[in-house]
């Protein structure tokens, strides 16, 4: 006498556990997404605004750069209220021949070793930029970027947790931040 053939589960029975796990994962992902802040999607190049001076600049959104950098000309260190500060100029985006003077406390000085082997000191300041609808503050190195296409480079330190970059797009969102008191 032969043993009865084992009954094979139906397609529905075999897929049901997998489908339930999938739905649970999707529900959990949706809840996590709703509970956290939404991420703004921006292009590889965007207009950003230096909040304190209300100056709009075109910036490269660079996910490959750890920190942000700003084209700074005629840098001059000085002391104010017992702290080290720096005065520098940026090119006026409305008039290439004009300059706008900014002053910030120096957070630190970083030494960068260049490809040529020489090292370069760069002052680092805290900068608040309006990027899309976000006011984001992060350390920004001051360097001469006049030979580069963009005066401003926004790195991951400014974008992390707030911005996703679509590298195939540009100028997706103009700077439009709420006032300081909101």
What is each model feature region?
Residues 14-27:
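Bacterial N-terminal signal peptides
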């Amino acid at each position: 006498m032969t043993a009865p053939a084992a009954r094979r589960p139906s397609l529905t029975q075999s897929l049901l556990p997998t489908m339930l796990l999938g739905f649970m994962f999707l529900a959990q992902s949706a809840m996590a997404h709703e509970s956290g802040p939404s991420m703004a999607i921006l292009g590889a190049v965007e207009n950003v605004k230096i909040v304190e001076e209300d100056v709009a600049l075109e910036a490269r959104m660079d996910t490959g750069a750890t920190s942000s950098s700003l084209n700074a000309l005629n840098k001059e260190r000085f002391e104010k209220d017992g702290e080290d500060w720096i005065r520098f100029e940026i090119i006026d985006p409305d008039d290439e021949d004009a300059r706008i003077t900014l002053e910030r406390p120096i957070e630190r000085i970083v030494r960068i070793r260049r490809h040529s082997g020489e090292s370069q000191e760069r002052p680092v300041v805290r900068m608040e930029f309006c990027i899309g609808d976000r006011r984001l503050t992060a350390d920004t190195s001051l360097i001469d970027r006049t030979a580069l296409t963009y005066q401003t480079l926004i790195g991951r330190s400014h974008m992390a947790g707030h911005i996703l970059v679509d590298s195939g797009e540009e100028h997706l969102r103009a700077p439009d931040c709420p006032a300081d008191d909101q």
